[in-house]
A protein has these predicted regions:
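N-terminal cap/leader regions of alpha/beta-hydrolase-fold enzymes
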Residues: 1-225
Length: 225
């Protein structure tokens, strides 16, 4: 009952802030306010838009919205998303560029599974597409996975990464962003010991908590209490 009351309180705060943001956006973007020289209304509309978006629930997975990429020939080439490895808790997908020869450089982006979809790395994918074959871990929302599929913990997460790296082979460059950095390191170390032929060519860790004590934060301080 205590946890339910806490959840209800947080949900009430979320919906209230979402409503405040929507109200501010509606009032600030009203056509009549645009006639006034005071920038307050534009600022209120911008604040309202950001606030409403921040406190809204992500009900539907955002689309990648990567339709074309400019090739070396200066032309637009169609980008298709194809599934390479399909698993209950996440897939390995590939951004296939039509009309272009496969690039020699192969990059695996390990996206975070921390309340965001892999589309959070959309801009990173777009920046890599002209120069590399881009793959990414497309994690599923846990609420959409039936209990019959079993558990998914740190060991399972690491096993998924090992499987994805094996599927792509030794010539892959792995880039782990934020939360999966330690697990990508563990998966790479596992392959280095047990299957060197599948070990990635390089491993880049961006913003990951490899050594939390290296730069103490409020979170690490709280963990020591």
């Amino acid at each position: 009952m205590r946890y339910m009351a806490t959840y209800d309180l947080m949900e009430t705060m979320r919906t209230t802030n979402q409503w405040l943001g929507a109200t501010a956006q509606a009032m600030g973007s009203y056509p009549a306010t645009g006639l006034m020289p005071n920038p307050f209304f534009q600022m209120a509309a911008a604040w309202g838009e950001v606030t409403e978006r921040t406190f809204s629930r992500m009900v539907v997975k955002p689309d990648w919205n990567i339709t074309t990429v400019v090739g070396e020939d200066g032309r637009d080439h169609v980008v298709e998303v194809e599934t390479v490895v399909k698993r209950p808790f996440g897939d390995l997908i590939h951004f296939k560029v039509s009309g272009m020869k496969p690039r020699k450089r192969r990059v695996l982006l390990v996206a975070p599974m921390s309340g965001h979809y892999a589309t959070l790395l959309r801009s990173t994918v777009m920046s890599l597409l002209p120069d590399a074959e881009v793959y990414i871990t497309d994690w599923h929302n846990a609420r959409d996975i039936p209990v019959s599929k079993g558990k998914f913990d740190v060991e399972d997460y690491t096993a998924y990464l090992v499987e994805f790296m094996r599927a792509l082979g030794h010539s892959t460059h792995v880039i782990a962003v934020c939360q999966p950095a330690p697990l990508a390191l563990a998966a790479t170390a596992y392959l280095a010991e047990h299957d060197p032929q599948a070990q990635p060519r390089s491993l880049t860790l961006i913003g990951g908590p490899i050594d939390p004590d290296a730069a103490a934060t409020d979170v690490t301080d709280f963990g020591r209490r």
